[in-house]
Design a protein with these regions (language model features):
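A glycine-rich phosphate-binding loop feature that marks nucleotide/adenosyl-phosphate handling sites
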Residues: 159-164, 395-397, 543
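Conserved short loop/turn motifs at secondary-structure junctions
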Residues: 213-217, 366, 446-448
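Phosphate/pyrophosphate-binding active-site segments
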Residues: 135, 195, 205, 296-394, ...
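Thiamine diphosphate
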Residues: 106-108, 112-113, 310-312, 318-320, ...
Length: 572
């Protein structure tokens, strides 16, 4: 079959089973867009900004496990997408991003809408390609999907000069069924000797803790993780990115850990003698002061990426491999042992954890007339019966959502963890809703974050996406204000958002339903009404207490055991 370069791109997407492409056209990709116009198998979603395309593809990938696909033009189209690409890279999200490029003969001449996309994106992609021949295009696309979805996932970018997709240049189409790359061979299983060594240490542990991250979600390893945790009766804590891999309602779950994790999770981490890290990378928001991190623990680290092991924290038993397979192998080894874990020690350990739990570290003051953001998230959980896909932006509202919306399933909590990208929530929700048209999708955001990509409300109308936007409006860049209160003697430099639009009218101007709530007693009814409109996007502006802070909080430079638990508390 003879195809042009533009037709090859579309045919490759069909052969990869891609159903949705999120993009924005421009001169360098018009040949590809013309090929898209002539077919119906791959649906194109027209966003209103290229950053939105990348975030939507990201949300699609996080909620499905399939690679998200974005298509943007050269120059500013590509640079606008960089924030979304970097967001995906930091959280190891599989994406393939197609960027247009100026024609090959004028590359390097500062041609119109030329940018060094390969150079610009090299630090924030798993790999990138500049296509130099139309004959190489199909194989390059196959490599991109393979690299993006295997090993530690991540975004892969393909930069395509306009002449490569010229409809007058047709070549024989041959899409490879398999790809072999000598320089890229991700491991398929963990070392059995290391697994047995780890189990030997775990069965002797007196104060063990599972510390699990986004890698468990990415590898669809929730079931073997849950099976292993319950077989051993060990406590488990999860990172912001790992929530839902083990059920939030599960009896072994001791809460999220880290800067805004629970008291019991952080104290258990500090006191543990055996730490089993699974698909987590020991980032600074988890460890606190590295020299004080898990001071008495032997550390077992399971990760698909060997470069993550002992990168931030030195580990005792490294296991390189896909976490799903490693966890299955660990459970098999556990079941083969004649002697199980130390039950007497575990009983004492759980008693200590229960004492920490009794601190009730997530309690908040319910007095006063203003709506508390924590309460708003609790109402959201109640109204959606805990069964929504929840996207968020970045800031206090993100932490409140993580703390108070109990996630019992993986891939339901969609947020930017590593890069912390404001503006992520709404376009990510678009990707989620396109992937799950019949599901309930809620975007928890703030008056600061939502305005970063608010133009995507038009995309929602164009494709009839019934997303529910829950805006926790406190009139501030909340997390910035909180840090200024704690560490800058309440000098709120440029963190106030005193001038914002009327979000109800703004939503209505985009063709959606807008609502505003200021009283606690009216919140549940308003939220019930909003979620009752199954076929409409509803923008719910919830005015919340501007003085509310996120607790617990580990202060910068402190250890995990040094937390503020309330406005009145000192470090504990």
């Amino acid at each position: 079959m003879e195809l042009s370069g533009g037709e090859i791109v579309v045919q490759c997407l069909k052969d990869e089973g891609v159903e949705h492409v999120f993009g924005y056209p421009g001169g360098a990709v018009l040949h590809i867009y013309d090929a898209i116009f002539k077919q119906d198998a791959v649906k194109h979603i027209l966003v209103r900004h290229e950053q939105g395309a990348a975030h939507a593809a990201d949300g699609y990938a996080r909620s499905t496990g399939k690679p998200g696909v974005a298509l943007v033009t050269s120059g500013p189209g590509a640079t606008n997408a960089v924030t979304g690409i970097a967001t995906a890279y930091m959280d190891s999200i599989p994406m393939v991003v197609f960027t247009g490029q100026v024609p090959t003969p004028v590359i390097g001449s500062d041609a119109f809408q030329e940018a060094d996309t390969i150079g610009i994106t090299r630090p924030c992609v798993k790999h990138n390609f500049l296509v130099k021949r139309t004959e190489d295009l199909a194989e390059t696309i196959k490599k991109a999907f393979y690299i993006a979805t295997t090993g530690r996932p991540g975004p892969v970018l393909i930069d395509i000069p306009k002449d490569i997709t010229d409809p007058g240049n047709k070549v024989t189409y041959d899409y490879p069924k398999k790809i072999k790359m000598r320089s890229y061979n991700p491991v398929s299983k963990g070392h059995l000797g290391q697994i047995k060594k780890a189990i030997g240490i775990m069965l002797k542990a007196e104060r063990p803790v599972f510390y699990t991250g986004g890698g468990v979600v990415l590898d669809n390893a929730a079931k073997p993780l849950t099976d292993l945790v319950e077989a051993l009766d060990f406590p488990i804590t999860q990172t912001l990115m790992g929530l839902g891999a083990y059920p939030g309602s599960g009896k072994h779950f001791i809460g999220m850990l880290g800067m805004h994790g629970t008291y019991e999770a952080n104290m258990a981490m500090h006191e543990t003698d055996v730490l089993i890290a699974v698909g987590a990378r020991f980032d600074d928001r988890v460890t606190g002061h590295v020299k004080q991190f898990c001071p008495d623990a032997k550390i077992i680290h399971i990760d698909i990426d060997p470069s993550s092991i002992s990168k931030n924290v030195r580990v005792d038993v490294p296991i390189v491999g896909p976490v799903k397979q490693v966890l299955r192998d660990m459970l098999k080894v556990v079941n083969e042992q004649k002697k199980g874990p130390n039950k007497e020690a575990l009983k004492k350990w759980w008693a200590q954890i229960d004492k920490w739990r009794s601190m009730d570290c997530l309690k908040y003051d319910t007095k006063g007339k203003m709506i508390k953001p924590q309460y708003a998230v609790e109402v959201l959980h109640k109204v959606t019966k805990g069964d929504a896909f929840v996207t968020s932006d970045v800031g206090q509202h993100q932490m409140f959502a993580a703390q108070f919306y109990q996630f019992d399933k993986p891939r339901r909590w969609i947020n930017s963890g590593g890069l912390g990208t404001m503006g992520f929530g709404l376009p990510a929700a678009i990707g989620v809703q396109m992937a799950h048209p019949d599901a309930t999708v809620a975007c928890v955001t703030s008056e600061s974050s939502i305005q970063m990509c608010i133009q995507e409300l038009a995309t929602c109308l164009q494709y009839d996406l019934p997303i529910k936007i829950i805006l926790l409006n406190n009139g501030f860049m909340g997390m910035v204000r909180q840090w200024q209160e704690f560490f800058y003697e309440s000098r709120y430099s440029q963190s106030g958002m005193s001038v914002t639009p009327d979000f109800v009218k703004l939503a209505e101007s985009y063709g959606h339903v807008g609502m505003r709530v200021e009283k606690s007693e009216e919140l549940e009814g308003a939220m019930q009404e909003a979620f009752g409109m199954k076929d409409r996007l509803v923008f719910l502006d919830v005015v919340v207490d501007p003085a509310e802070n996120v607790y617990p909080m580990i202060a910068a430079g402190k250890g995990q055991h040094e937390m503020y638990l309330s406005p009145e508390s000192e470090l504990v």
